[in-house]
Amino acid sequence: MAPKLQAQFDAVKVLNDTQSKFEMVQILDENGNVVNEDLVPDLTDEQLVELMERMVWTRILDQRSISLNRQGRLGFYAPTAGQEASQLASQYALEKEDYILPGYRDVPQIIWHGLPLTEAFLFSRGHFKGNQFPEGVNALSPQIIIGAQYIQAAGVAFALKKRGKNAVAITYTGDGGSSQGDFYEGINFAAAYKAPAIFVIQNNNYAISTPRSKQTAAETLAQKAIAVGIPGIQVDGMDALAVYQATKEARDRAVAGEGPTLIETMTYRYGPHTMAGDDPTRYRTSDEDAEWEKKDPLVRFRKFLENKGLWNEDKENEVIERAKADIKAAIKEADNTEKQTVTSLMEIMYEDMPQNLAEQYEIYKEKESK
């Protein structure tokens, strides 16, 4: 005998029908060919080249950062190779007045949003100056607590709306972050108040070593938007054009007062979760890695630009050499930054130092002068 409710309301059918509507949006296939002309963004040739330059530069930064970490010259570092399209194409769709609330893997976005590379290196080293962003860089320090940036983004977006700013707040997390309570609280608050926010889930298939299949029964992560009443979209995160267009349209909606959007980018990290001892060979197969390497966002976008006559090996080598020079100069500047002291940390905590800390400050100041 069929359940009584099912005769009038088949909840399973509703679920299946809903999930089937979340098809991954793609503009460029793995060979760099346009598969959906109608969705190609209105970017000039110069902008397309600039986006490619940023992706190449960032891949070199990732390689050098891993090397510097192994040398003991950088502290905490989360590799980014494989996620350049998800990170940089979304940032490229922003305006200077927009705010970025990054996770710990999202340093490239805030670098291209104005953060000096030296500051990024100091952040990795745990130096307080790595958290003191220059005036005009609309970004918060990378969030270490997984998912907490979603609450912060909702708050920043709400403030932008209250102040009548024509700007948005964008934040990022991985698939693992979408399992956190902060994720739901953030998107629900932003949805309820139509705050101008863009929530990006970079679905790289693993929360450290936990596969996505062990995190949720949902067929997509984009469909989680339905529960709070906002649009959700799943895009090919290895396709720079698809990521850009999805982010641009989400931004247009947000500044028009239509509220937030949830974007799931299907991507992959080629390296370990972080350089703090993670070994991806323990939970990923070489066959899986090989399949995703065929989808490399740089290779795909390179082929697209080469077909348009906008990119060649000489141009790429120029960017690589420039990246190496930039990194060398920035790490040298970081090396020459004065060491932090107890008093230097206390000086930046309060505008008016409490009496009990002021007394301790004088004690440490005397010790440090010896």
Curated annotation (Swiss-Prot):
Principal EC category: oxidoreductase
Cofactor annotation: thiamine diphosphate
Domain of life per record: Bacteria
EC code: 1.2.4.1
Gene3D superfamilies assigned: 3.40.50.970
Catalytic activity field: N(6)-[(R)-lipoyl]-L-lysyl-[protein] + pyruvate + H(+) = N(6)-[(R)-S(8)-acetyldihydrolipoyl]-L-lysyl-[protein] + CO2
Keyword Oxidoreductase: yes
Keywords assigned: Oxidoreductase, Pyruvate, Thiamine pyrophosphate
Matching InterPro entries: Alpha-ketoacid_DH_E1_comp, DH_E1, PdhA/BkdA, THDP-binding
Molecular function GO terms recorded: pyruvate dehydrogenase (acetyl-transferring) activity
First and last residue of the signal peptide: none
Gene Ontology biological process terms, A to Z: branched-chain amino acid catabolic process
CDD domains: TPP_E1_PDC_ADC_BCADC (cd02000)
Its biological purpose: The pyruvate dehydrogenase complex catalyzes the overall conversion of pyruvate to acetyl-CoA and CO(2). It contains multiple copies of three enzymatic components: pyruvate dehydrogenase (E1), dihydrolipoamide acetyltransferase (E2) and lipoamide dehydrogenase (E3).
Assembly, per entry: Heterodimer of an alpha and a beta chain.
NCBIfam families assigned to the protein according to its UniProt record, in alphabetical order: PDH_E1_alph_x
Protein name (record): Pyruvate dehydrogenase E1 component subunit alpha
Organism: Staphylococcus aureus (strain Mu50 / ATCC 700699)
Gene behind this protein: pdhA
